[in-house]
């Protein structure tokens, strides 16, 4: 059983418990403009992530204050803040998500492994404006159902792919925001070539986000020149002495610079 399979098995157990406990219904958080619109333009957008740990890197910043970190991200110009909420493998929590959404005005992504509608309800109840759907973790029927349910619930969706076959599945879904994960979730190996290759076949009107393994402004520049509208950065910002410097430098990257 690979890492992704183990995570999904854990999620099935979590979903079973959620269905017993229930989730309170809530109104979707209101934004001034859609996240899809926010990710447009010539500037390279930053989705800045709060990430305590990961299966591949172990503990990264267990004692981080998520509110203070989120405020640093927002003040530095992050377009979206991502909060990892998986507890077993990434040591995050829904409490982190709720605290961040109350502290900042920018949209917040609930970064988790969604396999059931009740997880979307939970993310919404804790203030998320955006959820993640990982194509590799879902069959087509479930993917389509969760995608439609999220939008019907007033949330937007980042649909994550890793290869050409997954990209085709996401395109059939007519996903508006596509994340290209440079990390293979089955082996947790990373290569920026994944984004460079998949960005060759962009569809008009879709926002493309390169995720994972981005460590330098030069890499951000390369990805933007290849067609990325934004980048999702977690570990690099969590380990940085001053994440604001990195975010501000990336915010200065424009298409017309190249």
From Swiss-Prot:
<dbReference type="InterPro" id="IPR011060">
    <property type="entry name" value="RibuloseP-bd_barrel"/>
</dbReference>
<keyword id="KW-0822">Tryptophan biosynthesis</keyword>
<comment type="similarity">
    <text>Belongs to the TrpC family.</text>
</comment>
<dbReference type="GO" id="GO:0004640">
    <property type="term" value="F:phosphoribosylanthranilate isomerase activity"/>
</dbReference>
<dbReference type="InterPro" id="IPR013785">
    <property type="entry name" value="Aldolase_TIM"/>
</dbReference>
<keyword id="KW-0028">Amino-acid biosynthesis</keyword>
<protein>
    <recommendedName>
        <fullName>Indole-3-glycerol phosphate synthase</fullName>
        <ecNumber>4.1.1.48</ecNumber>
    </recommendedName>
</protein>
<dbReference type="GO" id="GO:0004425">
    <property type="term" value="F:indole-3-glycerol-phosphate synthase activity"/>
</dbReference>
<dbReference type="GO" id="GO:0000162">
    <property type="term" value="P:L-tryptophan biosynthetic process"/>
</dbReference>
<keyword id="KW-0456">Lyase</keyword>
<dbReference type="InterPro" id="IPR013798">
    <property type="entry name" value="Indole-3-glycerol_P_synth_dom"/>
</dbReference>
<keyword id="KW-0057">Aromatic amino acid biosynthesis</keyword>
<dbReference type="InterPro" id="IPR001468">
    <property type="entry name" value="Indole-3-GlycerolPSynthase_CS"/>
</dbReference>
<dbReference type="InterPro" id="IPR045186">
    <property type="entry name" value="Indole-3-glycerol_P_synth"/>
</dbReference>
<comment type="pathway">
    <text>Amino-acid biosynthesis; L-tryptophan biosynthesis; L-tryptophan from chorismate: step 4/5.</text>
</comment>
<keyword id="KW-0210">Decarboxylase</keyword>
<dbReference type="Pfam" id="PF00218">
    <property type="entry name" value="IGPS"/>
</dbReference>
């Amino acid at each position: 059983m690979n890492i992704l399979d183990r995570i999904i098995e854990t999620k099935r157990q979590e979903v079973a418990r959620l269905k017993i406990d229930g989730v309170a219904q809530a109104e979707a958080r209101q934004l001034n403009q859609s996240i899809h619109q926010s990710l447009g333009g010539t500037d390279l957008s930053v989705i800045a992530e709060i990430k305590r740990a990961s299966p591949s890197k172990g503990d990264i910043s267990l004692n981080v204050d998520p509110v203070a970190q989120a405020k640093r991200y927002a003040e530095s110009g992050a377009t979206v803040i991502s909060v990892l909420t998986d507890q077993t493998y990434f040591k995050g929590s829904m409490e982190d998500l709720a605290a961040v959404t109350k502290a900042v005005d920018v949209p917040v992504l609930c970064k988790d492994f969604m396999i059931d509608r009740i997880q979307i309800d939970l993310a919404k109840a804790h203030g998320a404006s955006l959820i993640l759907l990982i194509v590799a973790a879902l069959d087509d029927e479930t993917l389509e159902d969760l995608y439609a349910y999220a939008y019907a619930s007033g949330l937007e969706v980042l649909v994550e792919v890793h290869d050409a076959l997954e990209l085709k599945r996401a395109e059939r879904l007519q996903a508006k925001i596509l994340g290209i994960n440079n990390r293979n979730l089955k082996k947790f190996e990373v290569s920026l070539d994944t984004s460079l290759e998949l960005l060759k076949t962009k569809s008009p009107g879709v926002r493309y986000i390169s995720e994972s393994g981005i460590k330098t402004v030069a890499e951000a520049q390369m990805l933007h020149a290849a067609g990325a509208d934004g980048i999702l950065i977690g570990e690099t910002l969590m380990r940085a002495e001053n994440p604001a410097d990195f975010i501000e430098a990336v915010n200065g990257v424009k298409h017309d610079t190249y």
